[in-house]
Amino acid sequence: MEPIWSELQLERMAGRTAAQAFVEGDIPMPAGREVERILQADAQIQNETARCADGRVDVDGTLALQLLCVSTDGIPFDVHASTRYNHTIPVEGAQEGMRAEITPQLMDIRTALDNSNRAHVEAVADMNATVQQDENMRVITDVRNARNLETRYEQAQLARVRPLTGVSLRSREELEAPGVVQVLRVNAAPHIDNVTLEANGAAVEGVMYLYALYLDDEHRLMQAMVRTPFSELIPLEMDVSACSRITAMPSVRDISGNVTTEGEALELNITTQIEVFCITREDVNTLSDAYSADGGVNVERQMVEQLTPVSTVTGLCRIMETLRVPEESPDVARVIFTTARPTVLALTDNSGQLAADGILVTAVVYADAQGNTNVFEEDIPFRCAIDAPFSPDAMVRVRPLEVRGSGVGRSVQVEYLLETQARLFERQQIMLAVDMQETEPAQRENGIYVYMADEGETPWDVGKRYGVTMEQLQEWNPDLGEMFAEGTPVLILSNSGRRR
């Protein structure tokens, strides 16, 4: 008997959990500015490092803030700042040297001014952690020169997310901004609609959603928005023949805005990073179990659990809501701008399809009839359908591309355009044979038996226990199924093994 060995490169899932992190910091206001109030706070959280240790993952990152303030002389201005955080996430099974992926999600943010002209910021974030171990495992794939050996095999699907390339794109866009004198805030949200593989690279098509907040020549707070399509052919120097799916992930690395020399418009300079990935797949047949009729073989087996990447699905979700102005607030004369921060609370099985349920934390900044700037917030429940089958192991992110508000009086109509991105995984458990040894034949009684099977037992279980081949078991029990019900009679003629 000669086992055939092979080495599998596995990504084993060691643990997965979620924890909440509290982030706080003090943000000094610009020198020479006396702040009357903070109108609106926006933030983005980005985890930068994750280090695995025994039973935990240590993470740190940055909370980037944009605070829209009003000075004591009634002039709006924007403050950009950041604060660092570090946190420890308990993860059972984590060990030093393993790899952790952290997906942070901002749940709540609060700001307050103190007497020293500083803003105290408190934020709560969900930290979703997945810990995996890259392991080369030596396994048995088959057996040579074995007599009367029954073997069973499993197909292991080895899939990996493989980075192909990354490119940095610079673009310049112009937004109409009548009467603009000062730029306060600029944001860009790139969305990729389509990625196709061509002979000389990956063709990427999408839309850039641009937004700017500025002051006009009457010191009024104004907003400008535009959508700009883009396309790019990204060269790929690596072999992509093994790729089953190609995905492109965009992110804004830098953005700045200036008033054009002619006035009446804003010039935005954007640097966008696009990372191109693919999923490679390899199906490997491995030995999962074996036995000999005389019981003279011992197989050591090990169960391995993998979280196998399947695909990344990106889509759009459009929502329209009517928001009511709180009783204590004045009527709306003009909506200045509207923001939304999506928070995903649960993944839902929507008739077999994946859906994300959550809250849109919405802020409406508006001017009243006297020209004063006001703000109110409301939490809007949402559900976004995703073009993918339901999977409890999916990692879903929802982000706003564009939020538009309009209306006067006591209500505001808000149109949300959200991007959904679902990374789909398949939880795979593989039984692998990691060792095999010949042993003394088992002692068995000659005779005829009728075995009453337990619920869920298989012919393999019975054959291995009593030392009979699958062919013999089928011959004696012509109506044998793949799995037994409780009390199913199985006829066995035991005539192998070492006799008593």
Predicted regions and their residues:
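Membrane-lipid interaction segments
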Residues: 1-445
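Primarily a LysM-type cell-wall glycan-binding module
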Residues: 438-475, 480-500
